[in-house]
């Protein structure tokens, strides 16, 4: 019995210590999981199982949930807009020879009077198949996303709504910019960090 009295406190301390260790190994944070992925990707690169570009894409994909829309969007002052008052030719001439895939559409040519957005590819298909059609018939409803949302949340929104662009809003619901699937791809490819 004296041996039990002597060992009991030691056994209780060891039990609590082991329980604490066990808890520490199972309760990983999101950043721990991301670091595990990055370590595995770097190990695969070191073993020459993947190339430099693949390593970069995988690391950026693993950290997508930590990146905010605000870091990848086109700021308000740089957003180019289709003006609903102008013809298709006038809009394209105004925007210049290098077009993006999509543009917000506005009643007055500013971000303050938006009516939706337009996909340039659809404009050209319509122009080829029925040139007399009005380009405004192709205006799509525009999505909105909070600038503090993660890029993973943005991609989920794009997939759920089957859209490729969104307006970026601040906490006061003021438009701060424009973001497209292309902007997210640039982050994934490492062209924008």
Question: Positions of the model-derived regions?
Answer:
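Membrane-embedded alpha-helical segments of inner-membrane proteins
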Residues: 1-43
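Soluble cytosolic regulatory domains appended to membrane proteins
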Residues: 28-193
